[in-house]
């Protein structure tokens, strides 16, 4: 298989192992769990999926839909849902932040960052959630569980960051002057 071929080629060229660990996905099946086949007409053109949904959405769908070692039921509607729900939410959240950061001239390198004392309860909550996410994702990757890591990131972006933090803090960004509270929100 290609694992051995790539490993052997790299070892011959470089004199070292190409990789120490490999995570491989199972078969990619159609949305009903059947083997894809041109003859049956249920095969998905990978280049068409990439053109329609984008590489990031296809990769994120494949990562978060099932563990890599399990067979994956590929559903184009699922890829579109990932594109809308995860990437759309991430894009809109970043767009909201960038709009107000640019209006306020905030770059993140301001010498007078808000002190932790200025952080509101919700600021401390989102920072706690972020630090917990970092720990959870790191542990998942170290345990070779990328699906668990991806799902945790999706949940954080869609629920904690967008649905709670941004929605409850919009007025802090709308304020006219840069005060400690607004600085803490950034």
List each language-model region with its residue ranges:
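Long, charged, mostly alpha-helical binding arms that flank functional sites
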Residues: 16-186
């Amino acid at each position: 298989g290609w694992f051995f071929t790539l490993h052997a080629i790299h070892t011959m060229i470089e004199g070292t192992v190409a990789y120490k660990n490999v995570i491989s996905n199972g078969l990619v099946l159609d949305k009903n769990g059947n083997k894809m086949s041109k003859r049956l007409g249920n095969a998905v053109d990978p280049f068409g999926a990439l053109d329609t949904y984008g590489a990031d959405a296809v990769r994120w769908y494949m990562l978060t839909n099932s563990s890599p070692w399990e067979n994956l039921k590929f559903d184009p509607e699922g890829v579109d849902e990932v594109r809308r729900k995860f990437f759309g939410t991430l894009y809109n959240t970043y767009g909201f932040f960038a709009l107000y950061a640019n209006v306020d001239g905030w770059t993140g390198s301001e010498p007078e960052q808000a002190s932790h004392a200025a952080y509101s309860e919700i600021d401390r909550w989102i920072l706690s959630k972020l630090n917990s996410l970092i720990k959870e994702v790191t542990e998942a990757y170290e345990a070779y569980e990328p699906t668990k890591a991806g799902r945790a990131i999706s949940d954080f972006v869609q629920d904690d960051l967008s649905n709670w933090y941004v929605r409850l803090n919009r007025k802090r960004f709308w304020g006219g002057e840069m005060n400690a509270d607004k600085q803490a929100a950034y």
